[in-house]
A protein has these predicted regions:
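Hydrophobic residue at the +6 position relative to the catalytic HRD Asp in the kinase catalytic loop
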Residues: 127-132
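Amphipathic alpha-helical segments that line or abut small-molecule/effector binding pockets
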Residues: 104-120
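ATP-binding glycine-rich loop module of kinase domains
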Residues: 10-55
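Conserved structural core of kinase catalytic domains
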Residues: 50, 69-108
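A short, low-complexity linker immediately N-terminal to eukaryotic Hanks-type protein kinase catalytic domains
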Residues: 1-13
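Protein kinase-like catalytic core scaffold
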Residues: 35, 70, 84, 140-143
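C-lobe/activation-segment region of protein kinase-like
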Residues: 119-124, 135-177
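The N-lobe alphaC helix and its flanking beta3-alphaC-beta4 segment of protein kinase-like domains
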Residues: 49-67
Length: 177
C-alpha cells in the first residue's frame, strides 16, 4: 500500500502504526506533514460489538473533546471510505516505555487526572497503555473509543493493571510475542 485517499485527497503511507479492534492506523504524509490515517476494518472481535464503526468513532471523538480529554485532533472523516485523518502525536507509547523499562511514574498523576475527567463525564476510555503517547511531557489518549462509565472498567479497577510490569502486563507481552 503506497497511498490512501481521504475525501479525495491522497496521502502517502509511511508505515503501519498499529491494529486495533476497529481499524488499522497508518503513519501518513502529505505536503511534508505527518498524520495518522485510520482505516476502519470489519474483522470480528469476540469481546466487543461496535455497530457502525465510523459513526461511533465520530461520536466518541465529540464526547471525548467535550469532556476535556487530551486527544489528537480529528482533521477529516471520510464516511464513504471509512477513513479518519488525525493529528499525529509523535512520541513513545506508555506500553513501549514499560516494555523498555522506562519509568512511567511521571505520568501517573496525568492519567489519574484524565480518568477523573472521564468519570465526571460518565465515560470510560480504553486505559490499555498502547493507547497513550507521551509528547513534550504530556500524555495523549490517541484512541477515540469511549463507553458509558462502569466501575469495573475504570482506571483504578482495570487500567492500572497494565501501567506497570504486573502479572497481567507480563502475560500480555508473553502472548503477544
Amino acid at each position: 500500500m503506497k497511498a490512501l485517499t481521504v475525501n479525495e485527497k491522497e496521502y502517502s503511507i509511511i508505515k503501519l502504526l498499529g491494529k486495533g479492534k476497529g481499524g488499522y492506523s497508518y503513519l501518513a504524509e502529505k505536503d511534508g506533514k505527518q498524520y495518522v490515517l485510520k482505516q476502519i476494518h470489519h474483522e470480528p472481535c469476540a469481546y466487543y460489538n461496535f455497530g457502525n464503526k465510523i459513526e461511533a468513532e465520530n461520536h466518541d471523538y465529540k464526547r471525548l473533546l467535550n469532556a476535556g480529554i487530551r486527544i489528537p485532533e480529528m482533521i477529516e472523516i471520510d464516511i464513504e471510505n471509512e477513513r479518519i485523518l488525525k493529528e499525529y502525536i509523535d512520541g513513545d507509547t506508555i506500553f513501549d516505555m514499560l516494555k523498555n523499562d522506562v519509568s512511567v511514574e511521571p505520568y501517573m498523576e496525568q492519567i489519574c487526572e484524565m480518568a477523573e475527567i472521564a468519570k465526571k463525564a460518565g465515560l470510560n476510555i480504553d486505559y490499555f497503555p498502547t493507547n497513550f503517547v507521551v509528547q513534550n511531557g504530556l500524555i495523549y489518549y490517541i484512541d477515540y473509543e469511549c463507553n458509558e462509565y462502569m466501575e469495573e472498567w475504570s482506571f483504578e479497577n482495570w487500567g492500572i493493571k497494565y501501567w506497570s510490569k504486573t502479572p497481567e502486563f507480563i502475560e500480555y507481552i508473553s502472548k503477544k510475542d
